[in-house]
Curated annotation (Swiss-Prot):
The keyword Cell wall biogenesis/degradation does not apply. Monomer. NCBIfam families: cysS. GO terms for biological process: cysteinyl-tRNA aminoacylation. This is Cysteine--tRNA ligase. Belongs to the class-I aminoacyl-tRNA synthetase family. HAMAP family: Cys_tRNA_synth. Gene3D superfamilies: Cysteine-tRNA ligase, C-terminal anti-codon recognition domain (1.20.120.1910), HUPs (3.40.50.620). GO terms for molecular function: ATP binding; cysteine-tRNA ligase activity; zinc ion binding. The gene is cysS. Zn(2+) binds at C29, C209, H234, E238. It catalyses: tRNA(Cys) + L-cysteine + ATP = L-cysteinyl-tRNA(Cys) + AMP + diphosphate. A motif ('KMSKS' region) lies at residues 266-270. One of its GO terms (cellular component) is cytosol.
Length: 468
């Protein structure tokens, strides 16, 4: 099988061919750290972490770089408003980001470069662009000339003339052409600044990523990823800067995730429907939030509602319950029989389907459907009088492998079941008793007892508590 990636640059799926066999250079645009991240920021963190996980599952060594923009107009303003130094504020929100995405199951990046630590590289990059004729200095500012780069607009599929018609020079700007964008900004009074050949100042946003990519991954990388909103101008400008500088293709594959809507409206501060990731993490199991994010293909918009999140919770519980049921039956299972061959074949086919779905532009929505099918078939298998450890292990290994790629860990619940899972098992036990399937009802009671959960049947229904 071969992996296909939808490339924003060509607007089609392409077979993934890394620059170096067995290795992947991947760069993801991280946050500007002036506040806690909202769920729109959390989506690319989850999506591209999952892409990384699948590439690693397929045997690739992934050099995964995610940057932090730690100096910016918004950061400077926020620092002034709260009376903090810019580096102190940036550190605080870098740590908050890592805490939030860590709770969402995001693996640590290979590197997390920051702008303040890359200043010498940024200045050297800008100097080279000036020497090559792609940029110019204007009274302490430095601007890049998109018209000097022949293929400008190729990522966003816009012509230079179309872009020119909507561009304006703002009051106070020193650029020669409305399309020109800042590589270096002259320092303002009382703002953090760095020394440069053009006087004290700080870099523009776009040049920061180009310099960090070059420093940590080289002139050409395999995958560059980020939110759909970054396609233009940020990623377009990155391409122009980097390819003008290096004379090489900047990135072979460009990946962009879709927007998040809140109750069918685009999330924005002006609408007041701005949802912080950490608020959801505190209110819900973060694994449910991740599961919800992956239930829709990454390129599609996703609509967030509490009802849909609750539905994701129920769906994940179904998978957890199937896994725990398998665990309970394993110890009482026997050796493999001839009748079990069909079940092993079913599990093998499911894993092939999972890989087929993920090979097709990382289709996590379809991969989750495979999980549901496996869970359903596992429950059917457990209804048989005799089960084998080999089949149970096959089911559990398959479910575990898929969940690991999706970044969802349910194994931590093996010793202490989540309350939601306990309730789901009690509900299943009630249904079994109602259908006079007393063997299954007793089996569930015994399983919960082994996990330290004591059931008490009362006239008002079943109550449960954790045993000492």
């Amino acid at each position: 099988m071969t992996i296909q990636i939808y490339n924003t640059l060509t607007r089609q799926k392409e077979i993934f061919k890394p620059l170096e066999e067995g290795k992947v250079k991947m760069y993801v645009c991280g946050p500007t750290v002036y506040n806690y991240i909202h769920i729109g920021n959390a989506r690319p963190a989850i999506v591209f972490d999952t892409v990384r996980r699948y590439l690693e599952y397929r045997g690739f060594d992934v050099d995964y770089v995610l940057n932090f923009t730690d100096v910016d107009d918004k950061i400077i303003k926020t620092a002034k408003d709260v009376g903090e130094e810019v580096p102190v504020l940036a550190d605080r929100f870098v740590n908050a980001y890592l805490e939030d995405v860590g709770a969402l199951g995001v693996k640590k990046a290979t590197k997390n470069p920051r702008v303040m630590d890359t200043m010498d590289d940024i200045i050297a990059f800008i100097s080279a662009l000036i020497e090559k004729g792609y940029a110019y200095e204007a009274d302490g500012d430095v601007y890049f000339k998109p018209r000097s780069f022949d293929t400008y607009g190729k990522l966003s599929h816009q012509s230079i003339d179309e872009l020119r018609s909507g561009a304006r020079i703002q009051v106070g700007e020193k650029k020669e052409d409305p399309l020109d964008f800042a590589l270096w900004k002259q320092a303002k009074d009382d703002e953090i600044a760095w020394k440069s050949p053009w006087g004290e100042g700080r870099p523009g946003w776009h040049i920061e990523c180009s310099a960090m990519v070059k420093k940590h991954l080289g002139d050409t990388i395999d995958i560059h990823a980020g939110g759909q909103d970054l396609t233009f101008p940020h990623h377009e400008n990155e391409i122009a800067q980097s390819e003008a500088m290096n004379g090489e293709t900047f990135a072979n594959y460009w990946m962009h995730n879709g927007y998040i809507n809140i109750d069918n409206e685009k999330m924005s501060k002006s609408l007041g429907n701005f949802v912080l990731a950490r608020d959801l993490i505190q209110a819900h199991d973060p694994r449910v939030l991740r599961f919800f994010m992956l239930s829709v293909h990454y390129r599609n918009p996703i609509n967030f509602t509490e009802a849909l999140l609750e539905s994701a919770k129920t769906s994940l519980e179904r998978i957890q319950t199937a896994y725990h049921n398998l665990s309970h039956r394993r110890d009482s299972s026997l050796n493999l029989t001839n009748d079990d061959a069909k079940w092993l074949q079913l599990v093998s086919a499911a894993m092939s389907k999972f890989e087929q779905d993920m090979d097709d532009d990382f289709n996590t929505a379809n991969a989750i459907s495979v999980l549901f099918d496996l869970s359903k078939e596992a429950n059917v298998y457990l209804q048989e009088n005799q089960t084998s450890t080999e089949v149970i292990d096959a089911f559990q290994d398959a479910i575990s492998q898929i969940l690991t790629v999706l970044g969802i860990n349910i194994l931590e619940d093996e010793e202490t079941l989540l309350d939601e899972t306990i309730e789901a098992l009690i509900k299943e036990r009630n249904e079994a008793r109602k259908n006079r399937n007393f063997a299954r009802a007793d089996e569930i009671r015994d399983m919960l007892k082994e996990k330290g959960i004591v059931l008490e049947d009362t006239p008002q229904g079943v109550r449960w508590k954790r045993g000492k």
